[in-house]
């Protein structure tokens, strides 16, 4: 049975565990930039570590940092934060981080994949913990600048110092996360629920449901442009209502016809067979089979992923959406 999560806010946390520590943020993409800026603006000492000079290097310089090569940033650091892509982390750790680890250093992750599936196995004399913002980097930064914060998950994998949770919460606070709330979890729970959510709903399930509805309408003779609005474009408005006001708030905002159709037909579309398949997908993640499959796929150059992206780029859904973009943008209110 599920238990009630422990949630920490600003009043429960302090920046003290991170004060005076040299923090190396590895990567300067969406999350890396937001983390580096927020931590620095919270008064912490931040260095950006990058593999090579390029756009990210120049962006970091433009933002007032003096970026270093990854290994140089790690050599000087007390805290190393991994914000490079998941599948690049193992190589970065092995070649750029592991040779320079010292007792008492901290390794920080924003997603548990590499630790949970043992792609990275740190020595026992360092702290290993996670701070995972539940939003994309630009939102993490925007909310922070405006005085708010994106909720975060925090977890501890190794607690050599005895203070790993306090340090995780200090970073969460510096990111702005405890302005909303930091939810305590585990690497296992964060990794598995993140992957299950992505596959069954956020990327896989929702996209395939939209495609199936769109293609069904087109096959029945309806115009692709009309089908696109009804099955794809309007989803954002419904999700925004749920995000802002919950399911009941959304239901109060739609017509009685929509409510009745949703309650009666929705359960026919998402039925027990669908739930069985959801459980199968979840078990594949929990067992580690998905991770094994993805690691093998990545090692072969990601042919399945490349094929999927190519097919989507050429799909009628995507082509219709591009044609309608001008109409959609023309009607968007000017800020």
Swiss-Prot record:
Record-listed substrate binding positions: 255
Binding annotation for NADP(+): 28-31, 52, 56, 86-89, 137
Lineage start: Archaea, Thermoproteota, Thermoprotei, Sulfolobales, Sulfolobaceae
Region (Disordered): 301-335
An MF annotation (GO) of this entry: magnesium ion binding
Organism field: Metallosphaera sedula (strain ATCC 51363 / DSM 5348 / JCM 9185 / NBRC 15509 / TH2)
Known cofactor(s): Mg(2+)
Any Gene Ontology biological process: isoleucine biosynthetic process
Record-given protein name: Ketol-acid reductoisomerase (NAD(P)(+))
Domain (KARI N-terminal Rossmann): residue spans on this chain: 5-185
Catalytic activity: (2R)-2,3-dihydroxy-3-methylbutanoate + NAD(+) = (2S)-2-acetolactate + NADH + H(+); (2R)-2,3-dihydroxy-3-methylbutanoate + NADP(+) = (2S)-2-acetolactate + NADPH + H(+)
Protein encoded by which gene: ilvC
Record note on cofactor: Binds 2 magnesium ions per subunit.
Active site residues of this protein: 111
Metabolic or biological pathway: Amino-acid biosynthesis; L-isoleucine biosynthesis; L-isoleucine from 2-oxobutanoate: step 2/4; Amino-acid biosynthesis; L-valine biosynthesis; L-valine from pyruvate: step 2/4
SUPFAM superfamilies assigned to the protein according to its UniProt record, in alphabetical order: 6-phosphogluconate dehydrogenase C-terminal domain-like, NAD(P)-binding Rossmann-fold domains
